Structure formats: C-alpha cells, structure tokens
Amino acid sequence: MKRIISSSKSLKQLSNIGYGSKKQIHCKSVVDSDSDSDSDSDSDSDSDSNSNSNSNSNSNSNSNSNSNSNSNSNNNNNNTNNNNNNNNNNNNNNNNNNNNNNNNNNNNNSVFSELILKLIAERVILINNYNIEKIEEIKGIPELMKSITSTTAETKNNYYSGSYYSSR
C-alpha cells in the first residue's frame, strides 16, 4: 500500500541548494517502505563530501601560519641580542667616565674647601671687631620684619573691605 508522506530528503535539499542549481525539489513524494534506505544513502554521501573539503582547507592554513611565525621569532631574537650587547658596551663606557669625573671632583673639592676656610676665618675676625651697637641693630631686624608684615596685612584687609578707596 502506497501512502503520501513529506520527505525529509527534500528539506535537506532546500538547505543545501544554491543559486542556479538544477535539482528539482519535491515537497511531497509517494514512497514505499523500501524507499527510506535510498534517502539515507544519499544524505550520507553529501555529508562526506562537505567534511573532506573542510579538512583540506584547515590543514593548508595551519602550515602557512606556522612557517611565518617561526621565521619572525628568530629574527626578533637576533635583534634583541645585538641590542643587549650594545647596551652593555655603553654602560662600561659610562662607568669609566664616572670614575674620571669623581677623581676631578675630589681635586676640586680640596681647593674649594681651603678657600671656604679662609673666608670663614676672615668673617669671624670681622664679627669680633663689630661694635656692640652694630650687633644690637642686627638683633632688631626681626622686629622690623614683623611690623612690615603686619602693615601689609592691614592694607590688604582695608583694600577688600572698601575702606582703602574711602581713605583716598
């Protein structure tokens, strides 16, 4: 007895079909119970062809990417080694220059310290020769500074309050 059923193969063909294909699609077909095995065999062959094409494309892309990455990494390592050697040479030169500068500074410091000692000795003599009145004048300088700062504070307050203009 024959019966009309919707074919699962026709739905698969709808999903796999592209523009310009010549396959005819039947949404309904008259099938026996024996015709189910035919539809299964066709669907298996389609899936096999798709899987083979995918595996080939993947293997090619992997081989190319590996070769490029290896060559680049080797070049970079060589460059960094050369740069490190140059930096070490520069550091050695700088250390030699620093040693020379330190020796020169030590010589200059000894001359400079002698001059400072002479100047300090002269200043001590001058301070001892000052009169007592001069020393008292020097002591009065901080009090003078206090009075100057207080007057500037008053003028600022008067300026902002408006009495600065009224006094003029």
From Swiss-Prot:
Residues 1-107 are annotated as: Disordered. It comes from the Eukaryota. Residues 1-15, 48-107 have a biased composition (Low complexity). Residues 33-47 have a biased composition (Acidic residues). This is Putative uncharacterized protein DDB_G0283223.
